[in-house]
């Protein structure tokens, strides 16, 4: 948007694209490209561009169709994901695929770091793919709907950490929601944001959610199969802090 404004390129920001599509179709675009666009594009727009509507989707389709593929890739424990360049159709990320590029999800990746990895490969992949789209030499690959999984937008319920599951699942949930919207747990009737954690090798005969220990290393909490160490958290109304500061503040 900033680049467009700086170069006197018209900017449209329809609140509801289905109701304001004529502003787009009146431009008679040759091609439309979207990335992380949160609305279903109406057929009037899909059928408008000469070379079609292209979407840059942050997963290896048909896996993780939907609005939160980066978050859900980590939360669900995927070890890889990627970028798919695809044609848009009336469905949710169901169109024919044009190109893909894969990235590895490291054990310490967060939603933020994975976003940055995918951003870094998306533009070069798009630029490499565009000429074949324009000259009609690209190969279209149908998606296998039987292999599809979905990554719907993160709900408020999904932000809440239940320790009544494996340490790995808790760890993945916390890093999968970092840096937005953030996972949280309830402590003393307060929603405490959990930003960073690690899996410990210790197992305790304690009810999941029980605080085992709190020291400068972190907040150790029992899980279904062991424990996790919360390293960085945030009290309502305050900035993020490590547990050393939290112990001083508590």
Q: What label would you give each PLM region?
A:
Residues 1-181, 190, 226-229, 235-237:
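One-carbon transfer enzymes
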Residues 163-248:
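An anion-binding loop in the catalytic cleft
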